[in-house]
Amino acid sequence: MSAKMKSKSILMLHMALLAALCGVLYFAYLGSTPFFDKGEPREALAVQDIVQRGEWLVPLKKTTDIPSKPPLFHWSAAISSLITGQLSESAIRFPSAVYATLGVLFLYVLGRKLFGANVALLGGAILATTTIYQNQALSARVDMTLCFFVTVSLGLFYSLYRGFLTREIWYYVFFSLVGISVLAKGPLGIVLPALVVGAFVVLKKRWDLVSKFCLHPGVVVMLILGAGWYVIAVTRGGEGFFDRQIIEENLSRFAGGSGHSHPPYYYIPYLFALGLPWSLFLPFLLWDSFKKGFLSDDDSLFLKLWFLAMFVFFSVSMGKRPVYILPIYPALSLLMAIWFYQHGAAAGTRRVLYRLMAALAGAAGLMLIVVTLGALWSHDPGWFFSPVERLLKAKDRANLLVVKNALATFGWSFTVVALLSGLLWLSLARSLWVGRLRSAAWRLVLIAVAVAFITRAVVMPVIAEAKSYREFMSKVDQQVTAHSKLLLYGSFNSDPVIFYRGGPIETLDQPLEELASRIGSGDLFIIMPEQLFVEIQKQRRDLPPPLLKSAGTGPEGDARLVLVRGGEL
């Protein structure tokens, strides 16, 4: 076999392996949980508006509310829903999983060109298994869409800089992708690539790149794609749209005038927490990167600036949420892969630290082996909850019982996964003990797959069902036909209720005292928080019980809902 054919075969094999890894981590769990937080149903309502009303240009929430983000994700989710023929959680989450998978594959292609196939394969696997990346790949939010287009934009810029891409058309592709990035999450689509490229140009003193890119005709294409939709949307949405998407979501968010304000050091703990399991090695990576020399080579420098420029920008911005730093992880993943291939056995303090990590990994492995043996002996996968159960309060014991019952539904499959995980942790401990870092890295990838099964198939569904209104709304639909009048009353997050109902629901706005006299009988149906119903019961002792009561407590965990009858208002 010729070298060219062998290289192509390796390329196809590695791409297939990474695609399979993403399939196991992402696509297998798209429908494993209902919507239960604030973010997903909020975006789902815009998708619902596109599918039901055909409002592609400026989709609205509840047919009246202007969404907080541009519609690129919503367009993608609407197309997914139309193709599958269902407006479901899995269909709406599908674009995030696709963008995440494409991002992993693109990072592999870029890393392969810069550092070789083996480093690129590990870099792609690291990105795919990083906690924040996995979470957003399974979330019906706009952040993975932005991350993908920013990643590809920066990768194309560097490929043009290095001369990997020489045809003029690639400049237009680059500018087009930057323009499209704006439709993912606003001006950040331009700001983030510009920060990285600008920092790179300054440090390399390549002033010729300024005129080469800033004066290129592709800039016009970028502006048309990025600003064109905003211009049209402002003419449709008027001052309300401008205030919502430009002032509140961008300028005020950066300056700290729209909530989520935090100090500059806010992201430091999240950098480690969201980067697990790979952030365990982040201190070593950062130390070695600066010790070796920040400007050591162009390829590593570009990745370092990708990470640092974005991290500093998000830290300086007053408005902060953990998910904002998602776009730094593609660069960090490649840097981590390079580090694993450049470092092996260590001496002195570092050997002690590696062996301390090995001891912790070994302890985790032994614990899982004990869990497995106990399950085989007692025929109860959740036997290990029993000693803890006696120490908890009644409410916590009830929650623990739910998790225990969920484990029982998986039977032997959970036991097998626990056993394999235990063996992998022990194997990881051995690799760390002897300083075989590359071997340890691949064991971490396999451990991440096992952890994904436990969290996505067992733990998260239990958490989701405790908060979601899906089951409640399914019962509401059985009692309240499409021809009956359904109303909402009270202050609670109604986005998931409206989504699962399948369309807008009118909201009542009147004092509780006026409503109380009309509750209990009539042709109307009203959904309200349980605590408000209790307040009405205090005024009317003869009030019949609600028709339905939700098991889910809502995104904030404090809004159990009831369905009641009401008279004409």
Positions of the model-derived regions?
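Membrane-embedded architecture of ER/inner-membrane glycosylation machinery
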Residues: 2-4, 172, 176, 288-569
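Membrane-integral, polyisoprenol-dependent glycosyltransferases
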Residues: 2-352, 370-373, 378, 498, ...
